[in-house]
Curated annotation (Swiss-Prot):
The keyword Glycoprotein applies. Residues 1-22 form the signal peptide. Disulfide bonds join C270-C323. One of its GO terms (biological process) is polysaccharide catabolic process. This is Probable beta-galactosidase B. It comes from Aspergillus flavus (strain ATCC 200026 / FGSC A1120 / IAM 13836 / NRRL 3357 / JCM 12722 / SRRC 167). Its EC number is 3.2.1.23. InterPro entries: Betagal_dom2, Betagal_dom2_sf, BetaGal_dom3, BetaGal_dom3_sf, BetaGal_jelly_roll_dom, Galactose-bd-like_sf, Gly_Hdrlase_35_cat, Glycoside_Hdrlase_35. It catalyses: Hydrolysis of terminal non-reducing beta-D-galactose residues in beta-D-galactosides.
């Protein structure tokens, strides 16, 4: 709501600001709160938390894509270490609700409460986005799969059936979150309603209301409020499409407190052609214009990006390893600074950590990996993009004046080079300015040198004044500051980028950085002398004393150098590589801590935390190898502990402690061997009895789905039979006749990259192998390769995999058989249809891993993939064999148990590699093919969908907690051969990295790996 408070964007800057006063914006912007609390406020400039302005820099991760609660701390510590002030999560209604009326917020990773307590403990604000629809390339966009039958109406509108279905989840999750709101002493600052739902108007120009959409949004808001949510409500419009839910545009039903915009300027998928209709022709590094849109959409609210591109998902058939080429460190450098140039003051990267689509969590668009080319990779490694993002997030955290700026210009007129554009941002209260420089044509990758005209408190200047020109080298942007406060000091200007600062023993330590080999220049006010404390790694050094300032010009080679000013202020000069491993680590858990109560550490791969106990400085973090470390800390520090061990200090001169940490940590995996194998498709045998609890007889004659099936059979859609994910098995019978059928026509829908195979009386009659984009297939299969029975029923078996439910309105698209028709000289009908479900159907026998982990294969139903299963029916696989093979068409399960013993103090990242015959892997000695589908299970978790005929993913990271790092690990692989020529795969595992770490990777994760239970036998 609008309230009477206002913030004046004033002119009180002083006459010394040449040419600035005339440009200042004197608009009086209203200061808003939601009428329930003023703990979180906002205006045209930024969010205010407890009265203090914040530049909110956040990033997203999904707890349900890393189902190990102990590792959530690992991720949050890495997010905190980089300088992010916040993080964001989606909740997942479908993950928490296996059946109507049932909610699970307790078992394993379903209990996400620890994320909110960790946010408080570690010191990060939290943006929570509970849906009920989240998209997220999740199965059905995060809706429970039991809602996809059509029985609940259109979904995502005010249909009473849908509202009744969602209310238990929505009310309960609001109650769970409420105690952790910032208004109740927690760190949750914003609560999102729905997701990318630009459905407020039937006609935006006339504001003809979309009543169903408005009432739906209002209902969600009301229920959240009724259940304790008093934080500001937000929403994220997609891709500058639409003008919904903004209080600045209307007083219509359903408006939220703060509206934001999601944008993926490169493309949200590696297949960039999918984004052409939204972003236009794909041009690498071409930025988009948000400034004008925000002025139109939300002029009295902060320019807010609840999702900005942190990477892209890799679709079926996409490149092995993802699409990082145009989404790497250069992307982070250019695009995130470009947002700042457009006055965006609240950013959340999607994704900061992507994780894994284990089980059947993925939508039809993606395979197992959800790495997303994120700054933190799927295996939790910090990649170069993380460090390149970190040098900006460290800056925005301490650049307090950046949270209130007007954009006074944006053109090439500031620059001496017409190829370089500059946006001038200025704080109307302090006069601090930020000049964001980039190529005028952002896709340009040229090297450009230039000077910049700036206005400062000491007049108009062209900078640098003495040194070499500023350089933009390729796809790069730089933020040049003027009148920048750090502690009690002021930078008149700096052409080197500010990284961070700290006030230690009452003296400022400022870190500046330039790319290796480039020049920088800075002027500090209030002091007129400087000296280089370390000249060993710089060149072309010039010091220019002034009457009341000192200017230093430098060219930075690799590493770190130190300049000391006459009053004891220290300036740390860094090249890019050194800046990447220069950490600003607070001594407290205040998310807003900026410069005080901070130590600076250079060298480690990661610094997680710092604590000063008496004169003991205790640091925790990770080391890749032997590393020389420099620590800027109070002079009172008498000892340094790293990960609980006292270090040997080499030097402690001038308040800089140097030491060497770590060694060359190593770990070798045991060989995976001892495989045993069994049939996992007994259902094709004529003597198989489909009478166990796994089977349901299809008797329903009318479908609730908006896409009705053919009327010649009962409803064969899996969801209407309480079966939702994975592989599905149909078993149909039809009688023998004198003029038997010759073919069967099948029309099956399974989503992108799905497939199916068909058997008649145990004889294989064909497969649809699928494609990366085909969601439905109809095909006629001949019976010429099968033997029809002359005196008893014939048995037709269809095995399909349901790749997932579609997103948005497509969630209602059916899964399963739409039409099955016998063809021949006579008239035929099936006697009976049965479907095999997962063990327990919607009453899952394994609530820890449920409800998206298991399908209906025999091996899954009886629990061969689970720890503790006695594999008595198995056959030994030859110890000389490096391959798992299936002769002919069929499905087999392979299983082994391998122990691990990872020493305490190591973070060992492990990935499985699955390969099949191809021209780039290996040639099968027996002529087996890659026409197969395999599922990788690790201690009961399905952690890999391997479809070599379609997809290119071969590496499958599996985290500790799923893997038992100090015990036996049950590894199972189901191999579905879809060809008469048989199939072959090789399974191995590799160490991705080994780090010495403070993080306890030997936590007790046994509760996450429940074993086999006897009840499984009832689903054979």
């Amino acid at each position: 709501m609008l309230i009477s408070k206002t913030v004046l964007s004033g002119l009180a800057l002083g006459a010394s600001f040449v040419g600035v006063s005339a440009q200042q914006n004197s608009t009086r912007w209203p200061l808003h709160d939601n009428g329930l609390t003023d703990t979180v406020e906002w205006d045209h400039y930024s969010f205010l938390i407890n009265g203090q302005r914040h530049f909110v820099f956040s990033g997203e991760f999904h707890y349900w894509r890393i189902p190990v609660p102990e590792l959530w701390r690992d991720l949050l510590e890495k997010i905190k270490a980089a300088g992010f002030t916040a993080f964001s999560i989606y909740n997942h209604w479908g993950y928490h609700s296996p059946k109507p009326g049932v909610l699970d917020f307790e078992n394993g990773a379903h209990n996400f409460t620890s994320i909110m307590t960790l946010a408080k403990e570690i010191g990060l604000y939290m943006i929570i986005r509970p849906g009920p629809y989240v998209n997220a390339e999740a199965n059905a966009g995060g809706l429970p799969l039991w809602t996809t039958t059509g029985a609940y109406g259109k979904l995502r509108d005010n249909d009473p059936r849908y509202l009744e279905a969602l209310t238990p989840y929505w009310a309960n999750i609001s109650k769970i979150i409420a105690p952790h709101l910032i208004t109740n002493g927690g760190n949750v600052i914003l609560y999102q309603i729905e997701n990318e739902y630009a459905e407020q108007w039937l006609d935006e120009e006339t504001h003809e209301p979309n009543t169903s959409g408005q009432e739906y949004m209002q209902y969600l808001e009301d229920v959240a409020r009724e259940n304790g949510i008093d934080a500001p409500l937000i929403h994220n419009l997609p891709n500058m499409n639409g003008h919904s839910w903004s209080k600045d545009l209307s007083n219509a039903t359903g408006n939220v407190d703060v509206i934001g915009v999601d944008s993926y300027p490169t493309c949200w998928t590696c297949n960039v052609s999918e984004c052409a209709s939204t972003n236009g022709e794909y041009i690498p590094y071409k930025t988009l214009i948000y400034y004008d849109y925000f002025k139109e959409l939300s002029p009295t609210q902060p320019s807010f990006m609840p999702e900005f591109q942190g990477g892209s998902y890799n679709p079926w058939g996409g490149p092995q390893g993802g699409c990082p080429d145009d989404l790497g460190p250069d992307f982070a450098n250019l695009f995130y600074r470009n947002l700042i140039s457009q006055r965006v003051s609240a950013i959340s990267l999607y994704m900061l950590y992507g994780g894994t689509n284990w089980g059947w969590h993925a939508s039809t668009d993606v395979a197992t990996s959800y790495d997303y080319s994120s700054p933190i990779s799927e295996n939790r490694k910090l990649i170069e993009k993380y460090y390149e993002t970190k040098v900006l997030t460290q800056f925005t955290k301490i650049a307090q004046d950046l949270s209130k700026v007007d954009r006074l210009g944006n053109s090439t007129k500031y620059s001496s080079n017409p190829a370089v554009s500059v946006a001038e941002l200025r704080n109307p209260d302090t006069g601090a300015a930020f000049y964001v420089t980039q190529h005028e044509y952002t896709p340009s990758g040229t090297v450009e040198k230039f000077t910049v005209k700036v206005n400062t408190s000491e007049g108009a200047l062209t900078i640098p004044q003495y040194g070499s020109q500023i350089t933009l080298n390729g796809h790069q942007s730089k933020i040049i500051v003027t009148d920048f406060k750090f502690g009690s000091k002021t930078l008149l200007y700096s052409t080197a980028e500010v990284l961070t600062y700290a006030v230690i023993d009452g003296k400022e330590v400022l870190a500046l950085w330039v790319p290796t080999g480039e020049s920088g220049e800075f002027t500090v006010k209030g002091v007129n002398s400087a000296k280089f404390a370390d000249k060993g790694r710089t060149a072309n050094i010039e010091i220019h004393p002034g009457a009341n300032n000192v200017t230093v010009s430098f060219m930075q080679r690799s590493g770190m150098s130190l300049v000391e000013l006459g009053d004891g202020t220290r300036i740390v000069l860094l090249d890019r590589s050194a800046a990447h491993v220069f950490w600003s680590t607070p001594l407290n858990n205040d998310p807003a801590e900026a410069g005080n109560n901070t130590v600076l550490v250079h060298g480690p791969y990661l610094v997680r935390s710092a604590k000063l106990e008496g004169c003991d400085l205790k640091l925790t973090g990770d080391i890749q190898n032997s590393t020389e470390v420099s620590i800027f800390a109070p002079k009172s520090v008498c000892s340094v502990n790293w990960n609980g061990k006292k270090t040997s200090v080499k030097s402690a001169k001038g308040g800089v402690i140097t030491t060497t940490l770590g060694g060359d940590a190593k770990f070798e995996l045991p060989t995976i061997s001892g495989w045993k194998s069994a049939d996992s498709l007994p259902e094709i045998a004529k003597d198989y009895s489909a009478t166990s609890k796994a089977w349901v007889v299809a008797t329903k004659t009318n479908s609730s789905n908006p896409t009705p099936p053919a009327p010649n059979n009962p409803v064969l859609y899996v969801d209407e039979n309480d079966i939702h994910v994975g592989n599905h098995i149909y078993r149909a019978t039809f009688p023998s006749t004198d003029e038997p059928p010759t073919d069967v026509y099948l029309n099956i829908t399974g989503g992108r990259a799905f497939s199916y195979s068909v058997w008649l009386n145990s004889d294989f009659i064909g497969s649809w192998l699928g494609t990366a984009t085909t969601e439905q297939n109809d095909q006629t299969f001949s019976f010429s390769n099968a033997t029809l029975s002359t005196d008893e029923d014939n048995i037709l078996v269809v095995v399909m995999d349901n790749s997932a439910h579609d997103l948005r309105d497509g969630a209602l698209n059916p899964r399963g058989i739409t039409n099955a028709t016998l063809i021949g000289p006579g008239s035929y009908s099936f006697t009976e249809w049965k479907l095999a479900g997962n063990a327990g159907f919607e009453d899952h026998l394994d609530p820890v891993r449920a409800p998206l982990n298991e399908g209906s294969l025999y091996a899954e139903r009886v629990g061969i993939h689970l720890p503790g299963y006695e594999f008595d029916e198995a056959e030994e696989v030859s110890s000389n064999s490096t391959s798992l093979t299936v002769p002919g068409a069929g499905i087999r399960v392979f299983r082994t148990v391998v122990p691990l013993s990872v020493p305490q103090g190591l973070d060992v990242s492990i990935s499985f590699r699955l390969t099949a015959p191809s021209n780039v892997t290996f040639t099968s000695a027996e002529g087996y093919t890659n026409q197969l589908r395999a599922l990788l299970f690790v201690n009961g978790y399905q952690y890999g969908r391997f479809n070599p005929y379609i997809g290119h993913q071969i590496d499958f990271p599996v985290p500790p907690g799923v893997l038992d790092y100090n015990g036996d690990n049950t590894i199972a692989v189901t191999v579905w051969s879809q060809s008469v020529d048989g199939a072959e795969i090789k399974v191995d595992w590799n160490v991705d990295y080994v780090h010495e770490t403070s993080f306890d990777m030997n936590f007790d994760g046994a509760y996450l790996r429940p074993g086999w239970i006897e009840e499984r036998r009832e689903y054979a």
